[in-house]
């Protein structure tokens, strides 16, 4: 009995131990402990590759297209041009990043670089074998070579890779100078001139991937073979499957992938390894995708089909075709899935049914029908759309394009597809564009200004009156200390310049100019930025800052230094004093300054203001601004004469003073006395101005012309009509201070950036966030920005970190006092009218934006067809586009080099259904009725101004002013008009 009890107790104990052990081994506690141990082992064994993040960022920022042409008569000229351009682009990126190229299969042109030359094709036998050592200073460069290389081994070296490669977005199709098909997952590529190759395609369509490297040395391979023979490998595999880790393992390299579009089916791919580990420590397939070959083939018993899905701007597209056939069809993936569902549900299916369901031509529908008959279970690979460079242009013609082989540098990027099918263009950085800049912005305008100038004795007297009115008491001004100027210049580059020049007082006055990086509606002469020596700018700034604070800020027409809310209030105060407002446009304002305006108005004001103790120094600083020797970035010398140096400390205030003087002079010539003419100047900000309509158009333009300026009246707006100032459209400033950013110009460039330093995703968020501050209620602009942000990862941005965002969000005071906005439905009419659409068409597209969910690359685009004529002949999008003819210029009297495109917005009140003028939708209301969304802001005569901006006094007649455009900075506003190019 005791023996039985003993055995029972022993069995119970054993059972308890087994059950307890099993429960313990399968418990979450043990799993967590093993996982924690595995994580610690991974942390100990993984290695971070040095500078990987920095290299990736540098490649993204430095990726600027360099175009290289080939000789005429080349058997496949277009393909060779793109290939050579890609190679030069990659070499440029590597060298600008501070690394050395290591070229695999270099051409004779790259013989000077380190590299590896092996024999992959007959053409390789022209050169000798070589295999230079790869170091940590190298970035590997490949042009059409990755198909033949073991990419797993190459990436396992831990060295960054740049390659130009074929990445088809369809299963067959045309390429430059040839075509391609796909059979057994291999591309068959045929090019004119005899090139005929077959190869597999690597799948780079993930942003982060891994690759497993195989043993390369003799002893490593021997150890692997012994482990396989003795069963150790099988045991390790069992432990790996059960525990997620095991002894031994192959090296695993993790890397990032970025793709940049070069042409149809052609990309530059950047691979940057950032970490290594061992395959035995982690279930790597659960962490991400392994680098593999593309799989196009969809096998079945009837016919082998190829399929690939491409994520385009309009959404996913699927390409289908029989293996080896050139004929293929591409259609939206959603449409194909709908057709396939209908095919499966239908009892009888004929080709005519597929034609009707797909909406495709009969020939394309036949391919779809054949695929449906084959009952392919499609598992197509997905190809992503790479990031694009924005559209760039280059001046052509005998005057500028003296080197036909020159290919300029591109810099602007797109962070999303354009809101419109029409997009802005950017001048590339080239010697021909520099010549066009000097001719179109300085030399040409100076010559025309001198031919127009006609200074009379009366004008000289009026100039003296203007100077005395602005500076009533002479000799009271003193400059601020230079330390004050340095405190205002807080940007890193400004601080560095201050530090470098603090102990150097002497300087040589040489102007160094460069072409401004900015967007244009259509090709135009690039703007010129002319910088002056640092000490000249700092010393002169000590006077301009002091004069601004003591004098300019206290005159009612001066708008710089005011917040957006204050400027909007000033616009409304001006409107309240008159029944008509006038917008004007200065063409090439900086380039049309002549000696009279500089010395008798601008300089005379500063010299009258300054104390005698400082007059000599100020006089020398002002004299330096005239006829200084100048040279462009690429070494072109030119004479700026008396034109405005756009990088000077005088730019904003000097332009504002000149703008105000033209208005004042016109008033005096119209018969007003000094005080009355002063009160009717209007408001100005640089070359932007707005005034009342009590002076005729002819007198305004003739007055400006006699001073050398080229002034045109853009809009004479009666009460209740839209008015534009500082590139913002006021629906009706007589009743509301609300405004919107000029829609057409903004939407052309909203998706682009000239910032080559910041991450493209960060720029996209910062730029859309900035517009949501200034224009969250603006139809289309606000909707597009919200749609972009809704479909990407949120970010926290500091506006001060970005240079390509609206000026009005860079200052905390501006942010807290932004532009007044209104949600009135009348804004839909304004936006639609400027885009050349009906309001219904605009609202339909806005509904698409509000409903869209998906990648930002698929944001809906609105089709527009506004005529945007180039202002000069350029090469753009692979074609030469001619500028306006001289005959057209003579016929219509327009200036082909003007800054403004033909305005699309109705510059008077919108027409009603009966054809008569009306004030947007206000005529739909009965007499005495008001729009609840538009607040009446007209000040009563007995009420004081509601803001700190001095209101324009309301004399007995109506007032004056001039218009212009967007301001990019208080230190240097640049001319970009409401519909500029």
From Swiss-Prot:
Its EC number is 2.7.7.48. SUPFAM superfamilies: DNA/RNA polymerases. Residues 883-898 have a biased composition (Polar residues). Residues 579-701 form the RdRp catalytic domain. One of its GO terms (molecular function) is nucleotide binding. Residues 915-936 have a biased composition (Basic and acidic residues). It holds the Pfam family RdRP_1. It is an enzyme of class 2 (transferase). PROSITE patterns: RDRP_SSRNA_POS (PS50507). GO terms for biological process: DNA-templated transcription; viral RNA genome replication. InterPro entries: DNA/RNA_pol_sf, Noda_Vmethyltr_dom, RNA-dir_pol_C, RNA-dir_pol_PSvirus. The keyword Glycoprotein does not apply. Residues 879-981 are annotated as: Disordered. Keywords: Nucleotide-binding, Nucleotidyltransferase, RNA-directed RNA polymerase, Transferase, Viral RNA replication. Residues 972-981 have a biased composition (Basic residues). Belongs to the nodaviridae RNA polymerase family. RNA-dependent RNA polymerase which replicates the viral genome composed of 2 RNA segments, RNA1 and RNA2. This is RNA-directed RNA polymerase. It comes from Atlantic halibut nervous necrosis virus (AhNNV). The lineage of its organism: Viruses, Riboviria, Orthornavirae, Kitrinoviricota, Magsaviricetes.
